[in-house]
Amino acid sequence: MRKKALFWAAVLLLLLIPFTTVFAAWGGEPDGNQHPMVGALFADFDGDGAISGFELVCSGSYAGPSADGAYDVFLTAAHCVAWAPSAGITQFFVSFDNEVLDSDGPTNLIGSVDFDWDPDFAHDSGDLHDLGVVLLPAGSVTGIAPVQLPPAGYLDDLKAAGTLKGTAIELVGYGLVPTWQQPGGTQFSFDGVRRTAAGTIKGLTQAWVYFNQNQHATGDGGLCFGDSGSPQFLAGTTMIISITSGGDPNCRANNYNYRLDTENARAFLGQYLALP
């Protein structure tokens, strides 16, 4: 009970920061095997030794073997893992199933060896350093090609060339799907399906990529609770440009995604991965 209480205290704390952290890609379709490198992150919250689909923490992606060959690296957001030590959680589990809520729960679970996050996480709201890694045993991820990371300054180069705004991206993740204008407000459902949806880049700052997920305005899909740490792919490629960090509480307007091509992001990622 103490472990559960600490976990929910951590969740409530996250909900109090200036924007709502985002824990499935809605407005799209079941992903099937389009993005097999996108996985779901779990923790054994009730301590029963069995992982349920409802113990989903976040989404993330397989980024390849570590530079030293010691681990397979699962990339996610810092806020997906930073709460764990204070809640007594010492291990995470990753599944690359495209559905994690069947009767047997997620299958092919890989238990972490360790996990880490950017030590500067949450120190600066302008650059949240919202990057984390879950370190899996070397060679444990098989038959799945990793995502590609972007070169340094990739998005700045697109902006300088005048081609950034409106660039097509693909959103992929697990988690909740919102239904708006319901009695009592927005309602959320969870079926544990990995989904993919289309998006377009709206803007860029030093640390963030923004896109508009107002479906009535754009026709695009969006992200919601369950998607934290999920990757944004440059459409038609395996290159990811950012990971999901936060958005509005109704999962209806803007979304904030942490860039992977900046000096600060690369400083952390370079501790674990060979960078382009």
Locate the predicted segments by residue.
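C-terminal subregion of chymotrypsin/trypsin-like serine protease catalytic domains
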Residues: 31-37, 57, 61-101, 190-204, ...
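Chymotrypsin/trypsin-fold serine protease catalytic domain
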Residues: 128-220, 255-256, 262-270
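Bacterial N-terminal signal peptides
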Residues: 9-18
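Sec/Tat signal peptide C-region and signal peptidase I cleavage site
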Residues: 19-24
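Core beta-strand residues in small-molecule sensory/regulatory alpha/beta domains
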Residues: 42-45, 233
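Bacterial N-terminal signal peptides that target proteins for export
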Residues: 1-9
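Short beta-strand segments
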Residues: 54-58, 106-113, 145, 188, ...
